[in-house]
């Protein structure tokens, strides 16, 4: 068991009730382009086309042969593009239940099948896109083989659902999904779970369970990779979420693309925080309708630390998100706020009176209580960075765009979520996730 001691469990109100309930009916879903870094689509459909569940919507020029399939049967109602015609979303109004069929395999057939047969089934169904590489967090090339695969079967994000609720319901499908993953690599398949959790495993010899405990980011894939099989410019691993492992198992037994998604609907502005069963790419306006407190609310697909702020073209559940968080927009500017005692304010530094009340939770808003300013090294980053890197030096290097120094300091190990806590505690109010992504894009492009 690996214990994470440096990090932060955010004391935020609105934690979800840990039992799965059915969510509201969803009438529209979308596939979000921003979920796939560097993707350049070649469209197979246009607005007004009827599509089946699992039908190809587009392919990717950058990862030849990879297919992106429809998360529902219905009509393509919008193809939204932004600047430079970057794909924002493909929206589908749900209608009917027509679905594409894919090959089925028994557990014995999976064990004896060659790797290419399993890859072909994942590609045809669109579930190949559930895999992400590290470094760069991109959909892997079809001819690539990872050094190992990491299954994230725990979640330490604020307001997250307990993965054991979901895995416990579909343990057989989870185990079968692990058997599929075991055939995709000659290395280990690490199933990373919370200490004390009961997680099904596979009979495959290369599947290995690893327990983690401690504060967030103990549940991040980047943390698991750092301690178990660190990556480099010449060494790649893949990551996948626990609900996608279940989807792998269901695909190979049913021959139909699974689209169920269990998410937490939580946060200070949710009237009844709970865990709901919905579907992949669900409209967040429909999912949260009648569920929010009064006020100007920000709906976030994902964690409050590293999720995506939703706007009209992209107000849908992200491909890799297992939660929907809602915060009040922080428009107020209190007079001389820096002079208050701070009984109702939170800081990782001992500057507020609230530090004396250890168990108190706070109604966080989107306010940063200040504008962007110079980066000040006061030891805040070191308090929340559990990885064996120098966070202050790394953050400075990516701010100035020194990619050579950033690589030497370990940026290739990281994804946006791995620097989310650094953004939260930053006295300079920097958002390090987008800065890291810009640097990773340059490194990959320049070699």
From Swiss-Prot:
Belongs to the NqrA family. Composed of six subunits; NqrA, NqrB, NqrC, NqrD, NqrE and NqrF. The keyword Translocase applies. NQR complex catalyzes the reduction of ubiquinone-1 to ubiquinol by two successive reactions, coupled with the transport of Na(+) ions from the cytoplasm to the periplasm. NqrA to NqrE are probably involved in the second step, the conversion of ubisemiquinone to ubiquinol. It comes from the Bacteria. The gene is nqrA. It catalyses: a ubiquinone + n Na(+)(in) + NADH + H(+) = a ubiquinol + n Na(+)(out) + NAD(+). Keywords: Ion transport, NAD, Sodium, Sodium transport, Translocase, Transport, Ubiquinone. Its EC number is 7.2.1.1. One of its GO terms (biological process) is sodium ion transport. GO terms for molecular function: oxidoreductase activity, acting on NAD(P)H, quinone or similar compound as acceptor. PANTHER family: NA(+)-TRANSLOCATING NADH-QUINONE REDUCTASE SUBUNIT A (PTHR37839:SF1). InterPro entries: NqrA (IPR008703), NQRA_2nd (IPR056148), NqrA_C_domain (IPR022615), NQRA_N (IPR056147). Pfam families: NQRA_2nd, NQRA_N, NQRA_SLBB. This is Na(+)-translocating NADH-quinone reductase subunit A. The keyword Transport applies. It is an enzyme of class 7 (translocase). It comes from Saccharophagus degradans (strain 2-40 / ATCC 43961 / DSM 17024).
